[in-house]
UniProtKB/Swiss-Prot annotation:
Belongs to the RuvB family. It comes from Clostridium tetani (strain Massachusetts / E88). It catalyses: ATP + H2O = ADP + phosphate + H(+). Its EC number is 3.6.4.-. GO terms for molecular function: ATP binding; ATP hydrolysis activity; four-way junction DNA binding; four-way junction helicase activity. DNA binds at R314, R319. The keyword Cytoplasm applies. It is found in: Cytoplasm. Has 3 domains, the large (RuvB-L) and small ATPase (RuvB-S) domains and the C-terminal head (RuvB-H) domain. The head domain binds DNA, while the ATPase domains jointly bind ATP, ADP or are empty depending on the state of the subunit in the translocation cycle. During a single DNA translocation step the structure of each domain remains the same, but their relative positions change. GO terms for cellular component: cytoplasm; Holliday junction resolvase complex. Residues 4-185 are annotated as: Large ATPase domain (RuvB-L). This is Holliday junction branch migration complex subunit RuvB.
Amino acid sequence: MIILDNRFVTPLSIEEDIDIEYNLRPTQLEEYIGQSKVREKLRIFIKAAKNRGESLDHVLLYGPPGLGKTTLANIIAKEMKGNLKITSGPAIERAGDLAAILTTLNEHDVLFIDEIHRLNRAVEEILYPAMEDYALDIVIGKGAAAKSIRLDLPHFTLIGATTRVGLLTAPLRDRFGVLCPMEFYNEEELKDIIVRSSKILNVKTEEEAAYELARRSRGTPRIANRILKRVRDYSEVMGDGIIDLNMTNKALNLLEIDKEGFDSIDTKILKAILDNFNGGPVGLETLAYFIGEELDTIEDVYEPYLLQKGFIMRTPRGRVATEKTYKHFKREIKKENINQYKFKI
């Protein structure tokens, strides 16, 4: 059984990302690279809210991890001149935990709830009047003697972030006025991020090298910055500190990140579908068990990039390796699979 521990190119935040992201994170919307549709929405709605002297309507950011949801929350708070309070769905275990947070908010503050799809129902119901009416309903007493008291809350902005928007309940989703789908970044955008980060880190990165780093960053800024830091280390020890194409290729080979941005785990996943399941279809639960990982982790962390790059496809019967996968591993493509799934790469 394959164990997926300490994966270098995971889009999830790891300990070393904390300092990197804090130093490299843009603080204004105009500095934010990529996500042009989201930026334009937020620019307009923030300006309109400020012109009226109101809080920004509640915002839902959704998409794969590592694409800049927390960064946008920080920017929104700064633009609205409010404080940012950060928490997560799993951290709010009881309704009282959320009530305690809500009562500390001030006018125009921003409450950022990561993994909002993991809120339990009792906690979620506290949010409904808070989002709609800026009010907190508290029940005092028990049984027949119980009574409800409504407390007014300041006008705040709730920003919810999720990788699984389909798991949000309709009542919660419908209370967000600004919906922002986050997409993987293209190579040009990632190259610009790498160039910007290189300047902040005071390291010279040649354009060719920046493009190569972008190509192998899985469409994810968090991974791009993490890889940049490791290639910087390699170039300082094995070269003159300048990140050129040669140094980049050597460092990425050492890190076992191939031309598609795949690491050894991606390769094992794809080869498992090809070799152990005859190219598919294979159910996600079966695949997760085979590679020794949780179902949600496969679906949230690993699969989105493989789907986006066209190396696997979803079918009603399970996941299937595409024609592109066969070509990548120089395997003979089975005619029955081509005819059955009508690959379009």
